[in-house]
Amino acid sequence: MNNYWADRMAASLNRLSNKNIKAIEKQMRKYYGTAMKTVINEFESTYNKLLASVAEGAQVTPADLYKLDKYWQMQGQVRHTLQALGDKKISLLGKVFEMNYFDVYYGINIDGLEAFNTIDNASVKHIINQIWCADGKSWSQRIWDDVSRLQQVLNDRLIECIALGKKPTELIKQLQEQFGVSYRRADAITRTEIAHIQTQAAQQRYTDYGIQEVEFWADEDERRCPDCGALHQKRYPVGAAVPLPLHPNCRCCLLPVVED
């Protein structure tokens, strides 16, 4: 396959994945926006009640916070809201990851060759939920880890603002920042998993076409990356454990080696 057709095929694969990434981002922004509004209202209401509970001019402390029934009620509400956010993310990602696998698998068509389809829904569900990273965690575990981290850091910011005598407006700003951090982590998980799924789907499609070798193809911009550039056009047996993606937002892919 010459460079022109290789670039076109790589661009086509990336377009399929980018379409699904954009669909996830659109829905994820809605989920985060709703959750953030609910959580911040709870925190702001609790902080204002705390400030109103002490004598005028007195400095509130974290110990005062723990005496408020409102604080413990807020904890339950925030836990419920973040749990719902996690559930929605898991459901959304699971569905779109499956869709992405099928989009890539059936989006690959090699002229002059006949493919024997060997994929089904159960197989795809198994593939997208496989643990493949060195830390031994699945993408869903990372989502729940982030939910727990977010709840902890939101509470930490509340305590810090109380201890430092910050105004409620400063607390709101810090909470918004932490929701932004969580959203970006979720986006990184999405992009990494989509890239991995693209590789798995392509490998299976090539196998079903009877392809013997694949070629690591770095996006034109990625060729300046020392890791991606070093592997550009390196060949592997089809089905080999190729290190893709190499980094977050990696746009490299595997292309079939087809004799002209």
Predicted regions and their residues:
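N-terminal leader/targeting and assembly helices and adjacent pre-domain segments
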Residues: 1-176, 260
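Acidic, glycine-rich two-metal-ion catalytic cores of nucleic acid-processing enzymes
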Residues: 173, 177-260
